[in-house]
């Protein structure tokens, strides 16, 4: 019970992912994961007041709000529940548009109805972090028709990437 959900930037998220043989999801995968969750909590955005949402006290406030919502719904730590945070995601836009090469892609924070609060957004610089950002990791080994593939290779494959991404 002694923990706090801490946001981080994309470089720290990727370093952790690499150390665990994982990758960040695409927006498409975030939607599929949301559809498969065991439950959902309501989105609870804090009103931005200057840089307040980037301060550690708001990280703690957000964590406390999530804990209270889990308790209210009877959810347990470790269950796959959606609605907690926006995701830092992989995006074709960051890889191909030079205007965004030093930015972070965020997406998600789904309402219980399934509607997304944050469409894919790539305009924050890569050092920007606020309480609403979360990191979800996906193991690099995936099965396609019973054959194991590396997810990074699938995302690079013109024939297969559509299984994991809906970006052009």
PLM segments and residue spans:
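Detector for Asparagine
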Residues: 53, 63-64, 103, 140, ...
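Generic structural hydrophobic/aromatic packing signal, biased to beta-strands
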Residues: 33, 90, 106, 135-137
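Short, glycine/acidic-rich beta->alpha junctions
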Residues: 5-14, 129
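Low-complexity, Gly/Ser/Thr/Pro-rich intrinsically disordered linker/tail segments
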Residues: 124, 128-168
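Second-shell loop/turn segments in exported
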Residues: 1-6, 19-20, 123-124
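Conserved hydrophobic ligand-interaction patch in extracellular adhesion modules
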Residues: 10-76
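Extracellular C-type lectin-like domains
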Residues: 67-130
